[in-house]
């Protein structure tokens, strides 16, 4: 049975994660406060950041940057700025 949580990012009740996806206290916070839908949105932004900024997860500085962007996006409502990216017009 799916768990329902109040998603901090979406500001509504939504289906929660099945298990903790990220380590440590931040991972616990994500598990308790971020829905599957919001996490999927973050993963799209994360992929774009990694590709456009040519980040490597072997570099501790790159991991710190990505974690800071994740916290800003999921918990502080800040949009991820990706240089050179123009969203498609609707």
UniProtKB/Swiss-Prot annotation:
Gene Ontology process terms (BP): cellular response to oxidative stress
Parts forming coiled coils: none
Tagged with keyword Iron: yes
Gene3D superfamilies for the chain: Fe(II) trafficking protein YggX
Assigned keywords, A-Z: Iron
GO cellular component, one term: cytosol
UniProt xrefs under Pfam families: Iron_traffic (PF04362)
Membrane-spanning ranges: none
Keyword presence, Iron: yes
Gene Ontology MF term list: iron ion binding
InterPro entries: Fe_traffick_prot_YggX, Fe_traffick_prot_YggX_sf
Subunit structure and binding partners: Monomer.
Similarity remark: Belongs to the Fe(2+)-trafficking protein family.
Function: Could be a mediator in iron transactions between iron acquisition and iron-requiring processes, such as synthesis and/or repair of Fe-S clusters in biosynthetic enzymes.
Protein name: Probable Fe(2+)-trafficking protein
Organism: Enterobacter sp. (strain 638)
């Amino acid at each position: 049975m799916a768990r329902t949580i109040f998603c901090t990012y979406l500001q509504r009740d939504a289906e929660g994660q099945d298990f903790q996806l990220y380590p440590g206290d931040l991972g616990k916070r994500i598990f308790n406060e971020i829905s599957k839908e919001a996490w999927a949105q973050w993963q799209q932004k994360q992929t774009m950041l990694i590709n456009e900024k040519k980040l490597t997860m072997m570099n501790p500085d790159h991991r710190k940057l990505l974690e800071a962007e994740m916290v800003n996006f999921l918990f502080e409502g800040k949009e991820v700025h990706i240089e050179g990216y123009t969203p498609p017009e609707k």
